[in-house]
């Protein structure tokens, strides 16, 4: 049982807690019989029920805005043939959880505003212009957009703006260095050599890796025979093989180096195969 339920059963002083005004008892002349029963908890307030500067809600609404009851357009869940008193009682006889939500969350009655905005928004718990006439739409203020999003977006744009000049400066620096190197090389070399280099670079494509030259069967057989007798070949024997096999001295030397590495690997594989234990 909420605080609003305790206080709504009072007969004389209908004071809504948290609100800035009293509700006149004349507005509740047609309340049901169970609301007129004396409540078990009588709450006495030191405030006077007759405040001269606060006027009843409906009198303010009808006098200030010049709206007649017959011109109200009902667009909510209530039919137009219901009287204003029944509509008011339907709003106040809702479940407790909805009433508390209406009073403390959605309804602007309990806000600390003046009498006119509170009076204009008294029946606005269903939704925007759900029961109220169209003349009350001007008193609904749309929720302002959160300013921190704009601020964060502005900061993000500023950060991007700061990063772009840095990136452009970094990109300009290598290009400037390359220009300096090219100018220095151009100044060091005479113009004739520069023209020759340009012509050579345009005519000759980019140098690729030299193609592999496989040995013939005869060359491999003679090299294997020599490797069988001498793993490390001396210089005289290497020159003799190079003349006989029509190879260069460097080719014979590299072949023996590769053959020794291959033999070492084969010996390790044989040992691992026979022992069954890997050797590291």
Curated annotation (Swiss-Prot):
The keyword ATP-binding does not apply. GO terms for molecular function: DNA-binding transcription factor activity, RNA polymerase II-specific; RNA polymerase II cis-regulatory region sequence-specific DNA binding. Gene3D superfamilies: Homeodomain-like. Pfam families: DUF3528 (PF12045), Homeodomain (PF00046). Keywords: Developmental protein, DNA-binding, Homeobox, Nucleus, Transcription, Transcription regulation. GO terms for biological process: embryonic skeletal joint morphogenesis; regulation of transcription by RNA polymerase II. It comes from the Eukaryota. Residues 208-267 bind DNA. One of its GO terms (cellular component) is nucleus. Residues 135-211 are annotated as: Disordered. PROSITE patterns: HOMEOBOX_1, HOMEOBOX_2. Residues 152-165 have a biased composition (Basic and acidic residues). InterPro entries: DUF3528, HD, HD_metazoa, Homeobox_CS, Homeodomain-like_sf. It is found in: Nucleus. Belongs to the Abd-B homeobox family. Sequence-specific transcription factor which is part of a developmental regulatory system that provides cells with specific positional identities on the anterior-posterior axis. This is Homeobox protein Hox-D11. It comes from Gallus gallus (Chicken).
């Amino acid at each position: 049982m909420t605080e609003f339920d305790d206080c709504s059963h009072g007969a004389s002083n209908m004071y809504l807690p948290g609100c800035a005004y009293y509700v006149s008892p004349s507005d509740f002349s047609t309340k049901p019989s169970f609301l007129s029963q004396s409540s078990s908890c009588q709450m006495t307030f030191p405030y006077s029920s007759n405040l001269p500067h606060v006027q009843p809600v409906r009198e303010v609404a009808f006098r200030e805005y010049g709206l007649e009851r017959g011109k109200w357009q009902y667009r909510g869940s209530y039919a137009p043939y219901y009287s204003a008193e029944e509509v008011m009682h339907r709003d106040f006889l809702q479940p407790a959880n909805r009433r508390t939500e209406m009073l403390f969350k959605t309804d602007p009655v309990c806000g600390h505003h003046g009498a006119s905005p509170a009076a204009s928004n008294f029946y606005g718990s269903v939704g925007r212009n759900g029961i109220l006439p169209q003349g009350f739409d001007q008193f609904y203020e749309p929720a302002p957009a959160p300013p921190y999003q704009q601020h964060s977006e502005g900061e993000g744009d500023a950060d991007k703006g700061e990063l772009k000049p840095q990136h452009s400066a970094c990109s300009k620096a290598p290009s400037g260095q390359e220009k300096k190197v090219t100018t220095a090389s151009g100044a060091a070399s005479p113009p004739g050599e520069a023209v020759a280099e340009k012509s050579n670079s345009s005519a000759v494509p980019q140098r690729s890796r030299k193609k592999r030259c496989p040995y013939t069967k005869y060359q491999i057989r003679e090299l294997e025979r020599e490797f069988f007798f001498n793993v490390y070949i001396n210089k005289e024997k290497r020159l003799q093989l190079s003349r006989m096999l029509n190879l260069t001295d460097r080719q014979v030397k590299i072949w023996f180096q590769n053959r020794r590495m291959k033999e070492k690997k084969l010996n390790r594989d044989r040992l691992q195969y026979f022992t069954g234990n890997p050797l590291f």
